Amino acid sequence: METVHATRNTQQVKVSVLGTGSLGKEHARIYAELAAAGQVEFAGVYDTVAETAQKFAQKHGVRAFASLAEASAASDAVSIVTPTTTHFELATMLLQQGRHVLVEKPMTENAAQATELCQIAQQKACVLQVGHVERFNPVFKYLESVATDPRFIETHRLSPFPARSTDIGVVLDLMIHDLDVVLAFVKSPVTSVDGVGIPVLSKSEDIANARLRFANGCVANLTASRVSPERMRKIRVFSGGPMTSYISLDYRAQEGFIYRIARDDEEESSLLKKLLRAKDSTIVSAFGGKRIVREPVPIAKDEPLKLELQHFVQCVRAHLTPDVSGESAKRALDLAFEITRQIRAQ
């Protein structure tokens, strides 16, 4: 995180939530928990449906704002958890008024809007964070620490058809999480993009696949579906370097396995003792004198959205640039737009 200059400097950050839909209510719940722990002041909620806002306000003991102006006046920072079509207008208004903003993904409807938001945030010296929650999943933090030379990445993000986010396709709804993760993880320019997809239940693509090639030789294959009978959020990474490995991780369960070639100096007896102590570990195969070992990975489980909102509050309080800044999110958004463009051109 880099230091930025802020226009408001309060010991206790006052936060509000715009939008009380399925995700907005989770923002409200977590801010209420953080407020109870003394980490933030939860000022209130706003929704175009006043009755809904009043319900959540009563539940959490905060104000139900009668207008956006009232919400802004009572806040240092705001979570925008509203339909994508409203993100640009709301974020622009709040940033211009010197408020720090966390806007849910996708950041905006188009690239020009995203660029403008980044410029306004910089001009007003405000924090602009985008809700790519998977970056705060302990799974991603673990992956960053062990797979230092990714060569091939495969992601699957599947879910049943949602009652929300039908204003956008599955690339902007689901795949964008994996685009953001892969870009942050690989840290190399994308040299080519190939996207395919089809609509099933909506006018936009409901199933999509994208293949990305990077300048450093890494390849990523991403699949997203919102018409799946099951839910899945998994990433698999083949990594080179000193310790060649294959890592299979589950974002939802926050668990997984690492498959690696046992070192030549790793004696059979000590290896077997280690495997016996580790649950679900095993020697999965042996060939040419080499042994492939499967080991469970040590991931400390936590709630990604809570970690994301804590990070936002910390950035506002300490005047830091967030890990998922507007500029960072725009890179994923640009890729998502290119993939959807290719799909619509089919």
Residue ranges and their predicted role:
Residues 162-230, 234-238, 242:
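Rossmann-like dinucleotide-binding domain that binds NAD(P)(H)
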Residues 27, 60-118:
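Beta-loop-alpha module in the N-terminal Rossmann-like domain of NAD(P)-dependent dehydrogenases
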Residues 108-165:
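A contiguous active-site-proximal alpha/beta segment in oxidoreductase catalytic domains
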Residues 1-9, 77-80, 297-299, 307-346:
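C-terminal helix-rich "cap/oligomerization" subdomain common to oxidoreductases
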Residues 66, 103, 128-130, 249:
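Hydrophobic residues in well-ordered beta-strands that form the structural core
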Residues 2-59, 182:
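N-terminal Rossmann-like dinucleotide-binding module
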Residues 200, 219-307:
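NAD(P)-dinucleotide binding in Rossmann-like oxidoreductases
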